[in-house]
Curated annotation (Swiss-Prot):
GO cellular component, one term: plasma membrane
Lineage: Eukaryota, Viridiplantae, Streptophyta, Embryophyta, Tracheophyta
Induction details: By Pi deficiency in roots.
Organism from which the protein derives: Oryza sativa subsp. japonica (Rice)
Protein name: Phosphate transporter PHO1-1
InterPro entries given in the database record: EXS_C (IPR004342), PHO1 (IPR052486), PHO1_SPX (IPR034092), SPX_dom (IPR004331)
Cytoplasmic side: 1-406, 469-492, 544-672, 740-799
A Pfam family of this chain: SPX
Length: 799
């Protein structure tokens, strides 16, 4: 059976860890008390009941904790434990509650407590009181935050239903197509008044506090003339694009849709230009009010509906976390008080638990009421009354891990090892990896296999990262915003790696066998590459389709970096590509080799010596750094944080270092060598500073952990120092360009492959500390759920 302390650590909300009861610290106080009691012959036992469920495996879903045991235990307690808010003067302790700005509990040890342990008992209850007060304060603050969010969402829902109703009425009056509205939102009937057939949008440019938002504002006719004057002057806010939508009852309603994609940005700009060129026909909603009425854009309403739906899901998740927080803390108080009774022999559970039961975090039912209300609203308006469908969004189930996956991992690993050993023996006998002038194999086939090897080595390192993050309770699924229940588990990643490498090495073995016998088999590596590309783009629901499509979306966002809003997973993946420059160059060469038809004649010189092809290869070396720099520029544009410009400078320095390397390869003069050393050394220092200080959060001079940071997830500090040293050594891999190491008769391409593999390993090592720092930042702000921006904002007409 699993001890409660391990269950407690494994099932708490990772980002709220410091707000939970410090159960381990209270246990240490009890051990000190045990030392005080033991000389007097008191029988000590600290065993815990084993009536708990086993520890859940997923870090990303702590709210899935099974609370049936907790409720059963609390129901078994005597009724006298509940309901009193007054101090209890019976037994070994007295618990008093002071009410001021908040509840504060203080416990006094009575003379009945033995004098030999009175000091330790007072220290224990002082710490226990502090924990209870901390839990109360945090619970109340989070509850108020969620209640405020719930109130805002109620207003958002009312506005959405009203606009959907007006849109439906307008469409039925003009196009006789009210049935085209979204059936998932129930609409109430509303009267629009007399309307004109030329009803259309009125566009304006406005400034808002939210970056990159598309805004819809309802204004009176007098405001429209001033607004058009601003548009004619060409003033367009850097932060937002404005769209005006009028209504009879809502005169100043802003619909803020984030411009996260190029389509939304282009659509907003097109609407602005169209409204500048076309006259604005006015229609009366009410002859006395004189308000301009316009139709409601259904596309904007769909985006708004999606945003509100996401906000409800995040609110429900947060309320679930808050319920978990309450029940786990209640269980912790019960367990630690039982342990105290066993150590001291004094009956204190009934007295102290009475105070805990009446405290705010346990007695308040507002969160549960709001949770039920959110569930009801979601079922009615976003699931068409289908509760099961709604629960798939609100409480997504985690995929069960199968032992079948583990079996196939072992099977594929065995196949890979056997085939790889056979391939190495055959390649050694054939002398394929020695320095030979007539080695067509190294020029034509080896780039394909080295490219796949680097790719799946990187994927394997990511699987190792997932194992380490899970063990360290780093909530990587929340950081990357992966869809709950659909993200890959580490076993899935290892299965993909082992199966793919077994296939690749098998093809390598077959190709080498044919090549040694003199058969023309140059098309085999090309078919292997084509097969993987077809599998990547396969539209059928097979071989992790959701993950493959998400990967393609991320690549699209990276390639068009300035046009898409940058999120964590996008720039994290772009950082991975910065470590895969050799793989990208191999991909470019292989594409040229097979597209140009050189594989038929084995004339590989075209893709090496042709000037424009060679220049393209150099451009590929710059691409990952360019994409990452553009992401920094977009983040600075969105957030106005100059730190992103400093980060952009790091990638510019990397591009300069790559350019110096290209210049040295073309002209191996002393001047080119000096330029390479100076630029590469400066870029390396820049990158090391950013790695240690910004990405890892280390090298803090005033930290309680010398030159590290205050909060560390790993227990051993020496690991952090060793990791910094390892990162420093691996960052200096560019020196091989200057030193030209020679390992006997081994081909230089094999040496380059090993150096590229070391960079991939460095990146995998870097990934762990990067996400550790991100997780600690979230934990420092107690950020366990996403804050989804809300689409509708009502403003005063004067604004």
């Amino acid at each position: 059976m699993v001890k409660f302390s391990k269950q407690f650590e494994g099932q708490l909300v990772p980002e709220w860890k410091h707000a939970f009861v410090d159960y381990s610290l209270l246990k240490k106080d009890l051990k000190r008390m045990q030392h005080d009691y033991s000389p007097q012959g008191t029988i000590i036992t600290t065993s815990t009941p084993h009536d708990h469920h086993q520890q859940q495996q997923s870090v990303a879903a702590p709210s899935s904790y099974n609370l049936s045991h907790c409720r059963l235990l609390l129901h078994k307690l005597p009724a006298a434990f509940f309901g009193s808010n007054n101090a209890d003067h019976a037994g070994a302790i007295q618990v008093r509650r002071r009410v001021g700005r908040g509840e504060v509990y203080e416990t006094e040890v009575t003379p009945e407590m033995e004098t030999t342990a009175a000091t330790a008992a007072r220290e224990f209850f002082a710490r226990l009181d502090a924990q209870l007060n901390k839990v109360n304060h945090f619970y109340k603050a989070k509850e108020e935050e969620f209640l405020h969010r719930g109130h805002s969402l109620r207003k958002q829902m009312d506005i959405l239903l009203d606009l959907k109703s007006r849109s439906s009425s307008s469409l039925s009056g003009h196009h006789r197509a009210a049935a085209g509205d979204d059936p998932s939102i129930s609409s109430s009937s509303a009267t629009s008044g007399a309307e004109d057939e030329s009803t259309r949008y009125v566009t304006s440019a406005t400034d808002t506090d939210e970056s990159q938002h598309e805004t819809a504002v309802m204004r009176d006719p007098e405001e429209l003339s001033a607004e058009q004057g601003l548009e004619d002057s060409g003033s367009l806010s850097r932060q937002s694009l404005g769209r005006t939508v009028s209504s009879c009852q809502r005169k100043n309603l802003k619909i803020n849709i984030p411009l996260t994609t190029p389509c939304r940005t282009i659509s907003a700009l097109t609407d602005l230009l169209r409204d500048d060129l076309v006259s604005q026909p006015k229609n009366k909603c009410d002859s006395d009010a004189g308000i301009t009425f316009t139709t409601i854009n259904k596309t904007k309403l769909r985006h708004a509906e999606k945003m509100i739906k996401g906000a409800f899901i995040e609110l429900y998740k947060g309320l679930g976390y808050l319920t978990t927080y309450r029940n786990l803390n209640m269980m912790a108080f019960v367990k630690i008080l039982k342990k105290f009774e066993k150590v001291s022999g004094k009956q204190v559970l009934s007295v102290y638990l009475r105070a805990v039961e009446s405290s705010y975090f346990n007695s308040s039912g507002e969160a549960l009421k709001l949770m039920d209300e959110v569930e009801d609203v979601f079922v009615r308006h976003f699931a068409a009354g289908n509760r099961r469908k709604a629960m798939k969004y609100l409480k997504p189930t985690q995929r069960k891990e199968s032992h079948t996956v583990t079996f196939f991992i072992g099977l594929m690993t065995g196949c890979f090892v056997a085939l790889f050993l056979g391939y190495c023996i055959m390649a050694h006998i054939a002398g394929m990896y020695t320095q030979r002038r007539d080695s067509i194999y190294m020029e034509t086939v080896y780039p394909v296999f080295s490219m796949f090897s680097l790719m799946f080595l990187h994927l394997f390192m990511y699987g190792c990262n997932m194992v380490a993050w899970r063990k360290a309770r780093i909530n990587y699924s929340f950081i990357f915003e992966f869809a709950a229940g659909r993200e890959l588990k580490y076993r899935d990643v290892f299965l993909v790696c082992t199966a793919s490498m077994a296939v690749i090495v098998g093809v390598m073995f077959a190709h080498l066998s044919l090549a040694v016998r003199g058969f023309h088999a140059q098309a085999i590596p090309g078919f292997l590459l084509l097969g993987f590309l077809l599998l990547l783009f396969c539209p059928f629901n097979m071989v992790y389709r959701s993950t493959r499509f998400q990967f393609l979306r991320i690549l699209r966002n990276i390639v068009f970096s300035p046009l898409y809003k940058v999120v964590m997973v996008d720039f994290f993946m772009a950082d991975q590509l910065c470590s895969q420059v050799p793989m990208l160059r191999s991909l470019e060469y292989v594409a040229c080799y097979y597209i140009s038809g050189s594989y038929r004649t084995q004339e590989y010189g075209y893709c090496i010596n042709t000037k424009h092809i060679r220049d393209l290869a150099y451009a590929v070396s710059f691409l990952p750094y360019y994409w990452r720099a553009m992401q920094c520029a977009r983040r600075w544009f969105d957030e106005s944080d100059t730190g992103h410009l400093v980060n952009l400078g790091k990638y510019v320095s990397a591009m300069l270092a790559a350019g110096a390397k290209v210049a040295y390869e073309k002209d191996r003069s002393l001047g080119s060598l000096s330029l390479l050393v100076i630029v590469s050394s400066s870029a390396t220092m820049y990158q090391l500073y950013w790695d240690f200080v910004k990405d890892w959060g280390l090298l803090q001079p005033n930290s309680k952990n010398p030159w590290l940071r205050n909060d560390l997830i790993l227990k051993s500090k020496s690991i952090y120092y060793l990791s910094m040293g390892l990162n420093l050594v691996l960052r200096l891999a560019w020196l091989q360009t200057v030193i030209h190491p020679n390992f006997g008769s081994l081909d230089s391409r094999v040496t380059s492959f090993f150096l590229a593999a070391l960079e991939v390993i460095r990146r995998g090592h870097w990934n762990f500390y990067r996400l550790e720092n991100e997780h600690l930042n979230n934990a420092g702000k107690f950020r366990a759920v996403k804050t989804v921006p809300l689409p509708f904002h009502e403003a005063d007409e004067e604004d």
